[in-house]
From Swiss-Prot:
Record gene name: rplC
Name of the protein described by the UniProt record: Large ribosomal subunit protein uL3
N5-methylglutamine PTM sites in chain numbering: Q151
Pfam families registered for this protein in UniProt: Ribosomal_L3
Region spans: Disordered: 140-164, 212-238
GO molecular-function terms, A-Z: rRNA binding; structural constituent of ribosome
GO CC list: cytosolic large ribosomal subunit
Keyword set includes Disulfide bond: no
GO-annotated biological processes: translation
Annotated InterPro entries: Ribosomal_uL3 (IPR000597), Ribosomal_uL3_bac/org-type (IPR019927), Ribosomal_uL3_CS (IPR019926), Transl_B-barrel_sf (IPR009000)
Compositionally biased intervals (Low complexity): 225-238
Subunit structure: Part of the 50S ribosomal subunit. Forms a cluster with proteins L14 and L19.
Superkingdom classification of source: Bacteria
Length: 238
């Protein structure tokens, strides 16, 4: 199981195929996504890579966080997240993962924080039908109606769908196809919509419900400090 990457949502556009058909895509940008730490079975009880992306000033950063980046010899990162991997998919600390970590045509799962909508009523939040337009209904056309029973159960159950805060939820969208890659600019174009607003942080990883293409680099495509892009050679029959 390979590592994913941390990207930022740039926005949506469209690309055209050779047949003239257009494909709506979301542009994701890798902002110097580097490995900042390892999690091992012996020390932590599980195997994972800790990745960081973006840049951050150290003025208001806690000393413990500054020390973490100093040990890894990488610049302080705005966003830090962990990705579970197998032991054979570890990438050296300090390596920068590139956009061609994925291949065109493969499917990925993306996770982000949905756009906040504020306080919303039942019709917008839960797609309720509302009340009638006439026949005695006044003012309450968009209300949700009754929320409970009578004497029994004598209360409104927890998790009842009611008006409230909408959005700002952690959303995962499965099986988005990679349409194009721009390694020089660190761009990944995936087909369809990605949850979150422009500039939001997005976790991108190999799709869990689709097979990984054979041409996908293992453990990944990355660039070490002062070196060329590297990827471990995949052994035949491994």
């Amino acid at each position: 199981m390979r590592s994913g990457v941390i990207a930022q949502k740039v926005g949506m556009t469209r690309v055209f195929t050779e047949a003239g058909e257009h494909i709506p895509v979301t542009v994701l940008k890798l902002g110097n996504c580097q490995v900042v730490g390892h999690r091992t079975e012996e020390k932590n009880g599980y195997v994972a890579l800790q990745l960081g992306s973006g840049s951050r000033k150290t003025v208001y950063m806690p000393k413990a966080e500054r020390g973490q980046f100093a040990v890894a010899k990488v610049e302080p990162k705005r966003r830090v997240e962990e990705f579970r991997v197998t032991a054979d998919a570890m990438i050296p600390v300090g390596a920068e993962i590139q956009a061609d970590h994925f291949v065109v045509g493969q499917f990925v799962d993306v996770t982000g924080t949905s756009v906040g909508k504020g306080f919303a009523g039942g019709m917008k939040r839960w797609n309720f039908g509302g009340l009638r337009a006439t026949h005695g209904v006044s003012i309450s056309h968009r209300s949700i109606g009754s929320t409970g029973g009578r004497q029994d159960p004598g209360k409104t159950w927890k998790n009842k769908k009611m008006p409230g805060h909408m959005g700002v939820d952690r959303i995962t969208t499965l099986n988005l196809r990679v349409v194009q890659l721009d390694v020089e600019r660190g761009l990944i174009l995936v087909e369809g919509a990605v949850p979150g607003s422009k500039g939001g942080w997005i976790r991108v990883r190999d799709a869990v419900k689709k097979p990984l293409p054979k041409e996908a680099p293992k453990p990944g495509k990355f660039k070490v400090a002062g070196g060329e892009a590297e990827a471990a050679a995949q052994q035949e029959g491994a």
